[in-house]
């Protein structure tokens, strides 16, 4: 749902810098990289196994517009700012971790940059939406399906 929503809005147009935060084995970032090869994708995760699988999937798909980095949130991604941050946040890590991810996204976004979040209503969507509003001063539900919500905030 996150990939479809994002690509519907940003498939074409000029090249953008996108970070897939908490990429896991890579389904979000790699799909966007494959469908929109003009975008530059940085994929980050703290889990070594996930990064290994993401790297393997990147090679199998022959994607040269993807960089994969180890980082706890965006704390180790230095000297880079992004047009978009996309995340399926690690809900089981707890509310504090999820909220820190939103704060780091705000810091790493360019002005007018956007944070896209996919989250289930029953796994903290109302709390996430409230925190995004608090940080960005805006949040909107841009899509929803089967209990999943796509929330978007823009940095002013």
Spell out what each predicted region is.
Residues 1-87:
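Conserved SAM/SAH cofactor-binding pocket of Class I
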Residues 32, 104-105, 132:
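Class I S-adenosylmethionine-dependent transferase superfamily signal
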Residues 45-48, 97, 120:
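Short beta->alpha hinge that forms the Motif I/post-I loop of the SAM-binding pocket
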Residues 87-96:
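Glycine-rich phosphate-binding "P-loop"
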Residues 99-111:
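A short glycine-rich, Lys/Arg-flanked "PGG" loop and its adjoining helix->strand segment in the class I
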Residues 112-119:
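Conserved beta-strand signature within the Rossmann-like core of class I S-adenosyl-L-methionine
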Residues 120-135:
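Conserved class I S-adenosyl-L-methionine
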Residues 144-156:
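Core SAM-dependent methyltransferase catalytic element
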């Amino acid at each position: 749902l996150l990939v479809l929503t994002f690509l519907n809005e940003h498939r074409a147009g000029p090249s953008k810098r996108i970070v897939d935060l908490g990429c896991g084995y890579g389904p979000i970032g790699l799909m966007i990289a494959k469908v929109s090869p003009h975008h530059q994708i940085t994929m980050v995760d703290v889990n070594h196994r996930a990064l290994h699988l993401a790297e393997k999937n990147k090679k199998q798909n022959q994607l040269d517009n993807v960089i994969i980095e180890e980082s706890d949130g965006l704390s180790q991604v230095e000297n880079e700012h992004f047009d978009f941050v996309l995340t399926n946040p690690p809900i089981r890590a707890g509310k504090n971790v999820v909220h820190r991810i939103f704060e780091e996204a705000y810091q790493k976004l360019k002005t007018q940059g956007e944070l896209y979040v996919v989250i289930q209503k029953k796994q903290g969507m109302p709390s996430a939406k409230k925190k995004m509003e608090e940080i960005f001063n805006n949040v909107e539900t841009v899509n929803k399906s089967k209990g999943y919500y796509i929330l978007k905030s823009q940095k002013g």
